[in-house]
C-alpha cells in the first residue's frame, strides 16, 4: 500500500502538488473508520456479519479497476496524459537517479543504501514512529478510557471513537494545502505535535466528560497533519528507483514501534491502574516526535544529503 502510494505520487506529481496528492490518497484512513462503525453495525443488524465481508469485497473492486485500467508506472506510459500535462510534470519535478544508464539493473543493497545511509530518513522515522505509537495506542485504548474513566456507555463510546478520525480528515486536508503553499513541512509537523499534546493534556484535566472527549479527539485528529508531510518529505529525499523500498522500510519500522504502544499501555495500566499516567506518556512521545520535526524546518536543502 504505502510503497505503491509513494511511488505513484513520486512519479506522477510535481513537488508542489505532492502535499495534496498524499492527502487525497490517505484521506480514506480517516474517512473509512468514521463511516465503517455505523455502517457495518447496520449491515450486521439488518443482515449478518458475513455480509460485511461481501460488502468489503465489493468495495475493493473499484480501486482495482481504476488502478489497473487508468494508471501506469510513469505518466509517459499513460495514453490519458496529454502533452501539456506531461510537460508540467517533467518541468516541475527534479528527478534524481541512481544510474544514468536506465537499462542498468540496480541491486537491492544499492537501493537500500540510498535511504539507510541518509540521516534524514532516520529522523523522519522517529517522527513517523511517534505518530504511529499515538495512533495505535488510541485505537486500542480510547474506547476503554471513555468507558471506564469518563463513564460513557458503550453506545456513546461507539460514535465518540469516530471523532478523532473525523477531526483527522479535516486536519489532513488542511495540511496538504499548507504544505504545497508554504513548503514548511517540518514546521507543520511540529505545530501538529504541539497542538496534539496541548489538546490531550487539556482534555485529561477537564472535569466535564463530554468536552474532555471532544478536546482529546481534537488533539488526536491534529496529529494527522503529520502524515502528508512525512510522505512528501520521503518523496523529496529518495530517488524514484528506491522509492518503493524506502516507503516499505519506513512504514514497516514505524508500524513495528506503533504495535508496541498497546502492549506498553496495557503493561502500565496493569502496574499503575492509572489512565492519566498513560496519557502523559503518550503526550511525551508526541512531543519528542515534534522536536525531531524541527530538524526539517532548519534547512530544507539538506534533505538530499
Residue locations for each model-derived region?
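Cytoplasmic helix-loop-helix junction between adjacent transmembrane helices
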Residues: 1-28
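A membrane-interface helix-boundary motif in multi-pass transporters
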Residues: 45-57, 267-285
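Helix-to-loop junctions at the C-terminal end of transmembrane segments
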Residues: 171-183, 269
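Juxtamembrane intracellular "pre-TM" segments in multi-pass secondary transporters
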Residues: 76-123
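A late C-terminal transmembrane helix in Major Facilitator Superfamily
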Residues: 235-274
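Helix-loop-helix hairpin linking two adjacent transmembrane segments in secondary transporters
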Residues: 25-78
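Extracytoplasmic gate region of multi-pass secondary transporters
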Residues: 111-173, 227, 231, 261
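C-terminal transmembrane helical hairpin of 12-TM major facilitator-type secondary transporters
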Residues: 184-233
Amino acid at each position: 500500500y504505502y510503497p505503491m502510494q509513494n511511488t505513484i505520487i513520486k512519479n506522477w506529481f510535481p513537488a508542489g502538488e505532492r502535499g495534496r496528492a498524499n492527502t487525497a490518497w490517505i484521506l480514506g484512513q480517516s474517512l473509512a473508520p468514521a463511516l465503517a462503525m455505523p455502517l457495518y453495525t447496520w449491515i450486521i443488524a439488518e443482515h449478518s456479519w458475513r455480509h460485511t465481508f461481501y460488502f468489503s469485497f465489493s468495495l475493493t473492486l473499484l480501486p482495482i479497476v481504476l488502478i489497473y485500467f487508468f494508471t501506469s508506472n510513469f505518466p509517459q506510459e499513460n495514453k490519458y496524459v496529454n502533452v501539456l500535462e506531461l510537460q508540467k510534470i517533467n518541468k516541475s519535478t527534479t528527478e534524481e537517479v541512481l544510474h544514468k544508464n536506465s537499462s542498468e539493473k540496480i541491486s537491492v543493497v544499492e537501493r537500500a543504501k540510498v535511504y539507510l545511509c541518509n540521516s534524514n530518513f532516520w529522523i523522519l522515522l522517529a517522527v513517523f514512529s511517534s505518530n504511529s505509537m499515538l495512533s495505535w495506542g488510541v485505537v486500542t485504548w480510547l474506547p476503554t478510557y471513555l468507558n471506564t474513566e469518563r463513564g460513557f456507555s458503550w453506545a456513546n463510546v461507539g460514535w465518540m471513537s469516530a471523532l478523532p478520525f473525523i477531526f483527522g480528515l479535516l486536519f489532513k486536508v488542511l495540511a496538504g494545502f499548507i504544505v504545497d503553499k508554504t513548503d514548511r513541512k517540518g514546521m507543520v509537523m511540529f505545530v501538529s505535535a504541539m497542538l496534539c499534546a496541548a489538546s490531550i493534556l487539556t482534555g485529561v484535566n477537564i472535569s466535564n466528560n463530554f468536552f474532555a472527549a471532544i478536546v482529546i479527539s481534537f488533539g488526536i485528529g491534529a496529529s494527522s497533519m503529520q502524515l502528508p508531510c512525512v510522505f512528501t518529505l520521503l518523496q523529496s529525499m529518495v530517488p524514484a528507483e528506491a522509492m518503493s523500498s524506502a516507503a516499505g522500510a519506513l512504514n514497516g519500522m514505524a508500524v513495528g514501534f506503533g504495535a508496541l504502544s498497546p502492549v506498553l499501555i496495557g503493561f502500565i495500566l496493569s502496574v499503575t491502574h492509572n489512565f492519566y499516567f498513560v496519557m502523559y506518556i503518550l503526550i511525551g512521545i508526541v512531543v519528542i516526535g515534534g522536536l525531531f520535526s524541527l530538524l526539517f524546518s532548519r534547512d530544507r536543502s539538506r534533505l538530499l544529503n
